[in-house]
Design a protein with these regions (language model features):
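Short pre-active-site segment immediately N-terminal to the catalytic Zn-binding motif
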Residues: 379-399
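Flexible, glycine/threonine-enriched loop-and-boundary segments that flank and lead into catalytic domains
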Residues: 356-373, 378-384, 504, 508-529
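Post-HExxH zinc-binding segment in Zn-dependent metallohydrolases
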Residues: 422-450, 459-461, 465, 540
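Catalytic Zn2+-binding segment of zinc metalloproteases
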Residues: 403-417, 437
Length: 617
């Protein structure tokens, strides 16, 4: 069995020109199109197909054949669009300095808009046909029955659609609906003046967001971290009334749209699209808030290990031990298939196809897009972009994106195009589970206690950041929106008081609280851009924790059944709403025990961390 002790190398790979990187570390986009000439032919053919929408307009009521023709045309255009878009987009991400390729990307975006305009008649015309008529057509024409879920969901979402005049008025409001976020973005980027602080080692640094995060994560001098925290939050404290006015605009906008569409709350309006009951979010918040002891245990352990008299939020990310070994990419390729053994041999085989099929662009090169992602090219296969640098973070990023890619691979193999895409509510479940499986694999094989501690801290920090912090944020959003729903004023003081109260409710006496923590809400971009979004990070984490337990604990027959249910989830794509998809996999997010699976997971990890730390002494 392969040992997981990493090769000890001197440094991460240096930045190389793309031409100097071996082909086996670069994706092969010829799987989509052989060259730009073939791409252009596909682009031109797609343009012609879009024009075919016009011949179908006004004919849907003529019978099931016409509706089926429209659905098939939409699928055909969608599949071709994926290929035309991703070939240009992935090529551009290899070197974003290439203006010629960027122009081609923009060409495709123009074609997107053209397709949207050409098909804008479809939904109103379809919804003019009574649902029982469409259901009868699906009985008469088996090929049309393929689209049952998609068609019936369109009708479901019409429950809160207004008449023509009402929809027109709401469409006019869209012109200013983004104003609070746009103003927030301008205030927080272009207009924000980043302060400078002098570190204990002598140099003066400007506190950009990246520099601020780096100090909190690497600087072992608590006074430096405290100074960075105070100076960074002072920027938001200075403008807190402006941030409050902007956030009030978000809250008022959300409540206006919810009332106009006759929802009982902003939460109900936000969840309606994915057919998520409000009880899911309410259960998530209530269960998490009453199960915070493992989080507090972790804080207290960190305080003791770091030797601090007082423990603050700015002490929460500094490593407990120093450990700087490197994890070469080719070594990790040997470990990944072993890590997914609990998912069965078929899954392992398909994962090797992803790893060794020229689907991954591994290393950074000049001009390459930063970060990492998995691109779902329907009709071809997923592609993965990495900027692998031999660090532990890069290892888990690879495992994370591999989870997404395997989800895409299985969904695309078993679903027609119309159901191949999956919602964010489900999307992060496989990626988070992939990380958890890889963590277990690494921990079982680690021989260095420092490595074990680093791995455990990585896992625990993931739960704190992706679960507890996101639930706190969701709790905050819910309470802030209820201010306007109840007709109460929204002031900076009230918003800060809600946030400060939640910090104390979740972290208890394990933290020493700084007054400037009160304004942390002001700097969270999701609050302004995508309200009621972050809870999904936490529900995905809870789902993966529940699945991890079922896949790795219990009898062989129980684990085999869990594997089958999990693979069915991946193969199901977007063929149903998220809740029933997860329920069929054995996860019911309306039940407290599902959320408590994360709590139990964290509790176990903290216990293992305590043991590993004691092993150093």
């Amino acid at each position: 069995m392969q040992s997981s002790s990493p090769v000890d190398t001197a440094a991460a790979p240096p930045l190389r020109n793309r031409a100097d990187i071996a082909d086996r570390f670069k994706w092969n986009l010829a799987h989509i199109f052989a060259d730009w000439a073939e791409w252009q032919r596909a682009y031109d053919a797609l343009d012609t197909k879009i024009a075919a929408y016009a011949a179908l307009q006004g004919t849907l009521a003529n019978g099931p054949d016409r509706l089926l023709a429209a659905m098939k045309l939409s699928d055909d255009i969608g599949q071709d669009t994926y290929k035309v878009w991703y070939f240009a987009s992935l090529k551009y991400d290899e070197d974003q300095r290439d203006n010629q390729i960027n122009a081609r990307r923009q060409q495709v975006q123009i074609l997107f808009a053209k397709a949207t305009q050409a098909s804008a008649w479809f939904n109103p015309e379809l919804l003019g046909i009574p649902l029982p008529t469409v259901q009868q057509w699906m009985t008469e024409l088996p090929d049309l029955a393929l689209y049952r879920f998609a068609l019936e969901d369109l009708y479901r979402q019409q429950e809160h659609v207004l008449d023509e005049n009402g929809e027109h008025l709401l469409s006019l409001s869209s012109r200013f609906s983004s104003s609070p976020h746009d103003a927030y973005a301008a205030l927080s980027t272009a207009d924000l003046r980043h302060p400078s602080i002098k570190l204990s080692t002598g140099p003066e640094v400007t506190l950009t967001y990246g520099q601020y995060r780096a100090i909190l994560a690497t600087n072992r001098n608590q006074a430096d971290r405290a100074a960075a925290f105070a100076a960074y939050h002072k920027m938001y404290e200075t403008n807190v009334n402006t941030y409050a006015a902007l956030y009030s605009g978000v809250l008022q906008r959300d409540w206006f749209h919810s009332q106009a569409r006759e929802y009982t709350s902003t939460l109900e309006a936000a969840l309606h699209g994915n057919n998520i009951p409000t009880a899911v979010v309410e259960n998530l918040i209530e269960t998490t808030k009453t199960n915070t002891e493992p989080l507090r245990r972790y804080h207290r352990l960190r305080k003791r290990v770091l030797g601090l008299e007082s423990y603050h939020t700015y002490d929460a990310t500094i490593p407990l031990v120093d450990f700087d070994r490197k994890y070469p990419y080719e070594q990790v390729l040997e470990w990944l298939p072993g890590s997914v053994e609990p998912l069965g041999s078929s899954y392992q085989h398909q994962l090797r196809d992803v790893l060794f099929g020229d689907w991954i662009d591994v290393y950074e090169n000049p001009g390459k897009r930063s970060g990492a992602y998995s691109a779902p090219v329907y009709g071809v296969h997923p592609y993965m972009l990495l900027n692998y640098n031999d660090t532990l973070d890069a290892v888990f990023t690879l495992a994370h994106e591999m989870g997404h890619s395997m989800h895409t691979l299985l969904s695309n193999a078993h679903q027609p195009f119309v159901y191949s895409a999956y919602t964010i509510f489900v999307a992060e479940v496989p990626s988070t589970l992939s990380e958890a499986l890889f963590l277990d694999y690494m921990l079982e094989r680690a021989t260095d206690e420092r490595e074990r501690i680093v791995l455990l801290q990585h896992a625990i920090d993931g739960i704190v950041g992706t679960f507890y912090t996101q639930v706190l944020f969701a709790d905050y959003e819910l309470q802030a929106h209820r201010l306007v729903e109840e007709g109460r004023p929204v002031t900076a003081e009230m918003l800060s008081e809600i946030y400060f109260g939640l910090m104390k409710a979740y972290h208890g006496d394990a933290l020493t609280y700084d007054e400037q923590s009160r304004v942390t809400w002001a700097r969270i971009p999701h609050f302004y851009s995508t309200p009621y979004y972050v809870y999904q990070y936490a529900t995905c984490f809870a789902s993966s924790a529940q699945l991890m337990r079922r896949l790795t604990i219990g009898s062989a027959s129980d684990r085999a059944a869990a594997i089958e249910k999990y693979l069915t989830l991946l193969k199901s794509g977007g063929s149903d709403h998220p809740m029933p998809l997860l329920q069929r996999a054995g996860v019911d997010l309306s039940k407290p025990e599902t959320v408590r699976a994360v709590v139990d997971q964290l509790d176990g990890l903290v216990t293992r961390l305590e043991t590993a730390i004691s092993g150093l002494r």
